């Protein structure tokens, strides 16, 4: 996958992309970009060169190197920064001499952009003349417009996740293992981990409510003895249960990852538990959890 040689025609510019957010690019294009840029070669600029052009610092690039798909993580991180757009991405690829990428992916990028524009136009046309209720996809107050690391500061494109992780600080090592197993593998799930994804400075109760109700499709509860003592975890769990009485929407998934001295919380006993402590089912644990989080 080398860059275009002297006989290669320059890549045609993709129209209508200069100001579109990177969210316009679907997973198919992102995966194909990764196929081109994840490969380290001596003859073509790879994802590290792109990261430098995007003004990522050395330590940030070293951190991205730990991921199975560094290009994908780079795009996710960059799209929350000022000036990030589809048009800017194409400019940087051109600057790096990756006309081969543009020639190969140009039509797909154009198609994604046109779909994005059409969707925006349709949503605009479907808006009522007088809005009777607040759109659930938009943060309810300005305070909640920029609460995660990849949020749109204006609140137009709030960051969304597959699952909110409810946990105690003492259980962070298991949460980190969850990140490795579910985000950095072929499951490619997106988890909301407060210590990693939430910006400081906003009321923790407001943030939790916004993320659990509006931004995350599921909530994983890491149950432990320390969890039972946490007021924050208690609030998050009860709030999630209130959104889906009787667990009809399979919104909440409890996890028991180590032996407990105290009784399992009665509020969660009626929900099927993902038990990491059972040696007979441990080999199926991550597959079961990933499939549960991937349900529509």
From Swiss-Prot:
Modification Phosphoserine occurs at: 244
Post-translational modification summary for this protein: Ubiquitinated; undergoes 'Lys-63'-linked polyubiquitination. OTUD4 specifically hydrolyzes 'Lys-63'-linked polyubiquitinated MYD88. Deubiquitinated by USP3 that cleaves 'Lys-63'-linked ubiquitin chains leading to inhibition of MYD88-induced NF-kappa-B signaling.
GO biological process: defense response to Gram-positive bacterium; defense response to virus; inflammatory response; innate immune response; MyD88-dependent toll-like receptor signaling pathway; positive regulation of canonical NF-kappaB signal transduction; positive regulation of interleukin-1 beta production; positive regulation of NLRP3 inflammasome complex assembly
InterPro entries, per database record: DEATH-like_dom_sf, Death_dom, MyD88_Death, Myelin_different_resp_MyD88, TIR_dom, Toll_tir_struct_dom_sf
Renumbered residue ranges of the record's region Intermediate domain: 110-155
Chief place where the protein resides: cytoplasm
Top-level taxon: Eukaryota
Domain TIR stretches: 159-293
Signal peptide interval: none
Subcellular location: Cytoplasm; Nucleus
GO MF annotation: an example: Toll-like receptor binding
Domain annotation Death: ranges: 32-109
UniProt keywords, alphabetically: Cytoplasm, Immunity, Inflammatory response, Innate immunity, Nucleus, Phosphoprotein, Ubl conjugation
Name of a matching Pfam family: TIR_2
GO cellular component: cytoplasm; nucleus; plasma membrane
Domains as described in the record: The intermediate domain (ID) is required for the phosphorylation and activation of IRAK.
Subunit annotation: Homodimer. Also forms heterodimers with TIRAP. Binds to TLR2, TLR4, IRAK1, IRAK2 and IRAK4 via their respective TIR domains. Interacts with IL18R1. Interacts with BMX, IL1RL1, IKBKE and IRF7. Interacts with LRRFIP1 and LRRFIP2; this interaction positively regulates Toll-like receptor (TLR) signaling in response to agonist. Interacts with FLII. LRRFIP1 and LRRFIP2 compete with FLII for MYD88-binding. Interacts with IRF1. Upon IL1B treatment, forms a complex with PELI1, IRAK1, IRAK4 and TRAF6; this complex recruits MAP3K7/TAK1, TAB1 and TAB2 to mediate NF-kappa-B activation.
Classification via PANTHER family: MYD88 (PTHR15079), MYELOID DIFFERENTIATION PRIMARY RESPONSE PROTEIN MYD88 (PTHR15079:SF3)
Function: Adapter protein involved in the Toll-like receptor and IL-1 receptor signaling pathway in the innate immune response. Acts via IRAK1, IRAK2, IRF7 and TRAF6, leading to NF-kappa-B activation, cytokine secretion and the inflammatory response. Increases IL-8 transcription. Involved in IL-18-mediated signaling pathway. Activates IRF1 resulting in its rapid migration into the nucleus to mediate an efficient induction of IFN-beta, NOS2/INOS, and IL12A genes.
Name this protein carries in UniProt: Myeloid differentiation primary response protein MyD88
Lineage: Eukaryota, Metazoa, Chordata, Craniata, Vertebrata
């Amino acid at each position: 996958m080398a860059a275009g040689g002297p006989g290669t025609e320059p890549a045609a510019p993709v129209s209508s992309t200069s100001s579109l957010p990177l969210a316009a690019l679907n997973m198919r294009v992102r995966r194909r970009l990764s196929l081109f840029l994840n490969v380290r070669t001596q003859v073509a600029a790879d994802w590290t060169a792109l990261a430098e052009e995007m003004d990522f610092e050395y330590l940030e690039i070293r951190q991205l190197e730990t991921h199975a798909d560094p290009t994908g993580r780079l795009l996710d991180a960059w799209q929350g920064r000022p000036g990030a757009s589809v048009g800017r991405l194409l400019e940087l690829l051109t600057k790096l001499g990756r006309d081969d990428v543009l020639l190969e992916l140009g039509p797909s990028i154009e198609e994604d952009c046109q779909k994005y524009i059409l969707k925006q136009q349709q949503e605009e046309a479907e808006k009522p003349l007088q809005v009777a209720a607040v759109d659930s996809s938009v943060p309810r107050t300005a305070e909640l417009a920029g609460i995660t690391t990849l949020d749109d500061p204006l609140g137009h494109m709030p960051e969304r996740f597959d699952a909110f992780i409810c946990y105690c600080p003492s259980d962070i090592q298991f949460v980190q293992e969850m990140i490795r197993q579910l985000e950095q593998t072929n499951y490619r799930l997106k988890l909301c981990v407060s210590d990693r994804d939430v910006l400081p400075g906003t009321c923790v109760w407001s943030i939790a409510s916004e993320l659990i109700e509006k931004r995350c499709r599921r909530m994983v509860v890491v149950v432990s003895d320390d969890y039972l003592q946490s007021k924050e975890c208690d609030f998050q769990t009860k709030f999630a249960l209130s959104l889906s009485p009787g667990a009809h929407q399979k919104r909440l998934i409890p996890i028991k990852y180590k032996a407990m001295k105290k009784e399992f919380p009665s509020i969660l006993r009626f929900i099927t538990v993902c038990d990491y402590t059972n040696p007979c089912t441990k080999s199926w644990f991550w597959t079961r959890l990933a499939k549960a989080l991937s349900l529509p």
